[in-house]
Amino acid sequence: MRYIRQLCCVSLLCLSGSAVAANVRLQVEGLSGQLEKNVRAQLSTIESDEVTPDRRFRARVDDAIREGLKALGYYQPTIEFDLRPPPKKGRQVLIAKVTPGVPVLIGGTDVVLRGGARTDKDYLKLLDTRPAIGTVLNQGDYENFKKSLTSIALRKGYFDSEFTKAQLGIALGLHKAFWDIDYNSGERYRFGHVTFEGSQIRDEYLQNLVPFKEGDEYESKDLAELNRRLSATGWFNSVVVAPQFDKARETKVLPLTGVVSPRTENTIETGVGYSTDVGPRVKATWKKPWMNSYGHSLTTSTSISAPEQTLDFSYKMPLLKNPLEQYYLVQGGFKRTDLNDTESDSTTLVASRYWDLSSGWQRAINLRWSLDHFTQGEITNTTMLFYPGVMISRTRSRGGLMPTWGDSQRYSIDYSNTAWGSDVDFSVFQAQNVWIRTLYDRHRFVTRGTLGWIETGDFDKVPPDLRFFAGGDRSIRGYKYKSIAPKYANGDLKGASKLITGSLEYQYNVTGKWWGAVFVDSGEAVSDIRRSDFKTGTGVGVRWESPVGPIKLDFAVPVADKDEHGLQFYIGLGPEL
């Protein structure tokens, strides 16, 4: 019976404490700015139901406030507590009145650098970031300075670095603080030989992917770049390049071992999609990321939709000198088109030499052969072409599948002449640009521009794939896909020799991954620039940032067009650049 009475007493005490806690609110007065923010951070671990007016809780709050102020140089605050009665409706308020007191000021920042750090520009630059004498102490500055010393060591290869001394001295009587740091970076390590394990690709190709030479000073960014370059080849399923520290302590020359595992020899991808331009589409792709020890690769794909059916291949041959940025590419395929007033069967074969520059630009020279049998409107022709061309392009982006910043630029020139067997003389210039910029996180702007020009004396022999048509999702919305072009006398589309289109789109982040869009597109496809016929479309849309890329739905109408006035809608999935 006595035990039961004791248990009941304990229970009543617990319930009483909980009731008090639930009826008391903590409030801090006397602080502002960074001091208030720091103290709030220290107090954030206290739950609202833990607040009580007792001495133990007040001591806990007192300690938290002092820690928050101490970090910013206030070591001798005055803290008084006052328990106020509740307002008409509410809880009692425990007030902590804080007077920060006199701050501790920086009295000296003594930092001694030894080893390679004495002459290293990054370490010397770091010395200039020390707080000035007389400024209020911030312990975070001191800790961040030490972290920066260590960070430079890891980044630049001072792997034997150590702090001989690291003290933050406080003289409370003087209200002064003194840094006292003695740091020895030791000798900087250098890159040694890179050994690869598990690779199916010849070693000389892998060695030419290494972005540094033996004996170069260590830089962590160079090691990261080697990992990136190996992964970018597409040859490997996994890549890990790691330094061998146990072999470098005496010589300070750091050998590296790259452990790789080959990617699966064959991969097959299938997909079903829909776009307003071509309707439902089925696509299948077969990839061989490596075919031999020279790193050759093959991609074959087929795509089937109602107006277009394609079958193509791409065979890539990296060059030993620079396997990632320089390569030959042989491409070929067959395409059948039945769209609007175009019916064509086209067979192509292209040999290209590519250079990917460190600036991000990609250059290529092409030699193209094609055989086209086509009916464009009222004209039927068979044309064989053999012509060279040059191309330069660059794509940059930041922010994932729906970039917050980016641009894509592509320029090409092709030239055909009957002197080497082509059926028609022509020169073609094309330019495409897309720019994406985001302001204040929620405001996104997308602009597009396209320019095309064909110069020829026999336009009827130019295949439809080289002629210009406007209209559609990536051209002028409000019009059907490839529906804008000069026409024959019977009203059938002929195609144009000149093209210019532009688009301005504004997107607003409504919530989460959802964006609203408004846009205006304009341009023309003509054969005589003296007979300008600009078309303009405008509309609204929705964007969803899905895990596989942006999905969009647009509604657009032509502007001031007496012949076209219906509503067009566009559904699409895929990158904007």
Swiss-Prot record:
Q: Which domain of life is it from?
A: Bacteria
Region POTRA1, required for interaction with TamB: what ranges?
22-106
Query: InterPro entries from the entry?
Result: Bac_surfAg_D15 (IPR000184), BamA/TamA_POTRA (IPR010827), D15-like (IPR039910), POTRA (IPR034746), TamA_POTRA_Dom_1 (IPR035243)
Coiled-coil parts of chain: none
Record localization:
Cell outer membrane
Q: Which GO terms describe its biological process?
A: protein localization to outer membrane; protein secretion
| One Pfam family of this chain | POTRA
**Extracellular side: which ranges?**
277-278, 307-308, 337-346, 371-386, 416-427, 454-499, 524-535, 558-567
Which residue intervals are topologically Periplasmic? Answer: 22-264, 289-296, 318-326, 357-360, 396-405, 438-443, 509-513, 546-548
- Gene3D superfamilies, per the entry: membrane protein fhac, membrane protein fhac: a member of the omp85/tpsb transporter family
Q: What does this protein do?
A: Component of the translocation and assembly module (TAM), which facilitates the insertion and assembly of specific beta-barrel proteins into the outer membrane. Promotes the assembly and secretion across the outer membrane of a subset of autotransporters, such as Ag43. Involved in the assembly of the outer membrane usher protein FimD. In vitro, when TAM is reconstituted into preformed liposomes, it can promote the assembly of several outer membrane proteins, including OmpA, EspP, Ag43 and FadL.
PANTHER family in the record: SORTING AND ASSEMBLY MACHINERY SAMM50 PROTEIN FAMILY MEMBER (PTHR12815), TRANSLOCATION AND ASSEMBLY MODULE SUBUNIT TAMA (PTHR12815:SF47)
Its UniProt domain note says: Contains 3 N-terminal periplasmic polypeptide transport-associated (POTRA) domains and a C-terminal 16-stranded beta-barrel transmembrane region. The 3 POTRA domains seem to form a rigid body (unlike BamA where the 5 POTRA domains are able to move independently). Upon substrate binding (Ag43, AC P39180) the 3 POTRA domains move away from the inner surface of the outer membrane by about 30 Angstroms, which would deform either the outer membrane or TamB and may provide force to reset TAM. POTRA1 is required for interaction with TamB. Possesses a dynamic lateral gate, which may provide a different environment for substrate engagement when compared to BamA, explaining how TAM may be more effective than the BAM complex in the folding of certain substrate proteins.
Annotated protein name in UniProt:
Translocation and assembly module subunit TamA
Q: Give the originating organism.
A: Escherichia coli (strain K12)
Organism lineage string: Bacteria, Pseudomonadati, Pseudomonadota, Gammaproteobacteria, Enterobacterales
